[in-house]
């Protein structure tokens, strides 16, 4: 009996020591944010900043893209394979230019607003009222940016034929809609 108690005691001590070592290691592990404190805008990576300034989509239009609403930049890339008419290509280019111009302007506003939020935290001048105002403004800007990209996808849906949309999805590597998915709306676009 004493031998069993001795072995159990050693096992318990060993487990406690291992847990203590693991807890210590966790305390000294660097944060996944380590190094990000040197960013010009703490909340944005260099890539995100560049994408915002360039008017790129950044995944904001995935709800459209993955539900059979093609994006104008990819429609332009696939123009030959989609057999776009000259009129379709022209309208697609125009839609892309409008979207990109609006997205660039909103992106620049987002960066400015993120810098402002960063500054009030860095200087210790943030308070609840300021936080509420600034985050609401950022939320509105991000919403405008997303709406800008989504609207361009809606425009493409009205411009392309159902066959072109199906070809687009195939060329982009998307599978057919699942059987339970809502049917694609009828296309009454201008061709």
Feature-to-residue mapping (PLM):
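Charge-rich (acidic/polar
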Residues: 26-191
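Sec/Tat signal peptide C-region and signal peptidase I cleavage site
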Residues: 21-25
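N-terminal secretory signal peptides that target proteins for export/translocation
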Residues: 1-7
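Bacterial N-terminal signal peptides
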Residues: 9-20
